[in-house]
Amino acid sequence: MIIYATAVQTINSFVRLESLKEVYGLIWIFVPIFSLVLGIITGVLVIVWLEREISAGIQQRIGPEYAGPLGILQALADGTKLLFKENLRPSRGNPPLFSIGPSIAVISILLSYSVIPFSNHLVLADLNIGIFLWIAISSIAPIGLLMSGYGSNNKYSFLGGLRAAAQSISYEIPLTLCVLSISLLSNSLSTVDIVEAQSKYGFWGWNLWRQPIGFIIFLISSLAECERLPFDLPEAEEELIAGYQTEYSGIKFGLFYVASYLNLLISSLFVTVLYLGGWNISIPYISILELFQRDQIFGTTIGIFITLAKTYLFLFISIATRWTLPRLRMDQLLNLGWKFLLPISLGNLLLTTSFQLFSL
């Protein structure tokens, strides 16, 4: 009996140990996801504060200054206010579409962050088709906007949803062609491989110098995808009140607000990854990989800092563009996408393909 009891205790302790391993395994799965979401939320709050400060400087006025030091908690205060506001529903709208639309817009953009390499080996999902996964997922967001516009049963909302879909289709194609040119130069669709392909010559190894036309087209197309001035036709205040957001209030309106800045941040991160060398130091023959091999924590920290510095540089350009340029007309926006950016990006892809073939 003593031997039997000892065997039972051994088995029970083994089962408990295996259960603890499974629990710890699940925890370690969610730790990087939670860290990424926390970092994204912090980044969005910083962007909102930066936009308020930069716009105040451009317009020669005082920005937010009461909510926290230098007004840095103003975005948090706005989010809290929206959280406690009443959620109104249009009486004759389509409740399922009206409720699901904002969630689709936010979730589709959030999933795109999984393929962003913030530093060496610091990426949630290093996929062989990472760059195409971003394009595929980001094309889902306009469907949510169209659902929101249709489900609101409002002519302004519906027109805003249609404009969002038309604008996304018009600028998604030139953006995809620019991404194809980059993947041809790097011989890979992985975001990590694209960054590493730019690491050899430092500043001069960036794809910005090898693809200047593609960079400009990608810049314009990404701003149009973010629906920011001068491309904010889907929510033009003078024409459509607030576009597809007209009937929304409370937390659902806040989701659209967050989705706009999430889209701006992911576009800036992809500009950094595709054209500005990602996490690499802009000094020839000095790579983050060398620092990472010496000290992993120090190398990772430096890589994150460099990635975010390049990202926020592009964000400054995007914010300054919003507050300095006038809005385009709808016909001008579509003509720019279909008659100019699409042929130029296609020609750029053909030139890149030709150079790659001749260099073999």
Swiss-Prot record:
It holds the Pfam family NADHdh. Its main location: plastid. Keywords: Chloroplast, Membrane, NAD, NADP, Plastid, Plastoquinone, Quinone, Thylakoid, Translocase, Transmembrane, Transmembrane helix. GO terms for molecular function: NADH dehydrogenase activity; oxidoreductase activity, acting on NAD(P)H, quinone or similar compound as acceptor; quinone binding. It is found in: Plastid, Chloroplast thylakoid membrane. Coiled coil: none annotated. GO terms for biological process: aerobic respiration; photosynthesis, light reaction. It is an enzyme of class 7 (translocase). NDH is composed of at least 16 different subunits, 5 of which are encoded in the nucleus. HAMAP family: NDH1_NuoH. This is NAD(P)H-quinone oxidoreductase subunit 1, chloroplastic. It comes from Nasturtium officinale. The gene is ndhA.
